[in-house]
Design a protein with these regions (language model features):
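Extracytoplasmic thiol/disulfide redox context detector
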Residues: 1-112, 189, 228-235
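Glycine-centered flexibility sites
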Residues: 63, 101, 131, 192, ...
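Structural alpha/beta surface segment adjacent to cysteine/selenocysteine redox centers
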Residues: 67, 75-78, 83-162
Length: 235
């Protein structure tokens, strides 16, 4: 059973207005590094680095820009089922389809569950401006806490940013509260509304440039159904 948006009673249209969360608040982490590295990194950071190394990223898209098939994923950073998909299914899809240039993955991050989702989304969008969105989100999934317990606070955001080699940490923290970040968050919500997204993860697959179709997942780590949709799109 996947997480339904209605359970959380967060209307997509109201998400942008609900940014009362302190997205731009300073972190209490001492000795903030200028650049991220694997020194004193969060658990899972080396694994994420190996998993994504060499795969091109641009904004919220992972994979070759000439890939013939696109997978669109709607995810919430607090969603435990999204964590299953991202840490169990996605790595296999990266190996089979993304690295060979057959598939690109477009992440559209929603915030159905609560304030931590909002805070994490803003930071992920800021990471996307440095082409590190997938590094950031994968690392958060590796270190995911219990929903709405405050686990995704400024310290977690800062620690995650500091665990991504090469990422400009102060820039990410500053970019979280920019107008560009707010606009992208609103765009994700509008896209989710248009695609009728009511639960996470929601996965759509189709030929690049065409309208993708939703894939019904038997379980959050259902690689087989997603792979079948990719193969069909590849022809």
């Amino acid at each position: 059973m996947l997480i339904a948006a209605g359970i959380v009673v967060v209307a997509l249209a109201a998400v942008g207005a609900a940014l009362g969360v302190a997205l731009s608040g300073g972190s209490s982490k001492a000795n903030l590094p200028a650049r991220g590295s694997l020194v004193d990194a969060l658990p899972g950071a080396p694994d994420v680095q190996r998993e994504l190394e060499g795969i091109p990223q641009r904004g919220n898209v992972l994979g070759s820009p000439s890939a013939p098939v696109t997978l669109v994923e709607y995810v919430d950073l607090q969603c435990p089922y999204c964590r299953q998909f991202e840490t169990e299914a996605l790595p296999e899809l990266l190996t089979r389809y993304v690295r060979p240039g057959k598939l690109e993955v477009e992440a559209r991050i929603v915030a159905f569950i609560g304030p931590d989702s909002e805070r994490g989304r803003a930071a992920a969008i800021a990471a996307a401006r440095q082409s590190k969105l997938f590094n950031f989100t994968q690392l958060l999934y590796f270190n995911q806490g219990v929903e709405n317990t405050g686990w995704l606070d400024d310290d977690m955001v800062t620690s995650a940013a500091a665990s991504i080699p090469g990422l400009d940490v102060p820039r990410l923290l500053s970019d979280r509260s920019s107008a560009t970040t707010d606009e992208q968050a609103s765009a994700f919500d509008s896209q989710a509304n248009a695609d009728g997204v009511t639960e996470t993860p929601t996965i759509l697959v189709g030929k690049s440039g065409a309208t993708p179709r939703q894939v019904t997942l038997a379980s959050p780590d259902d690689v087989q159904s997603v792979a079948a949709a990719i193969q069909a799109a590849l022809g």
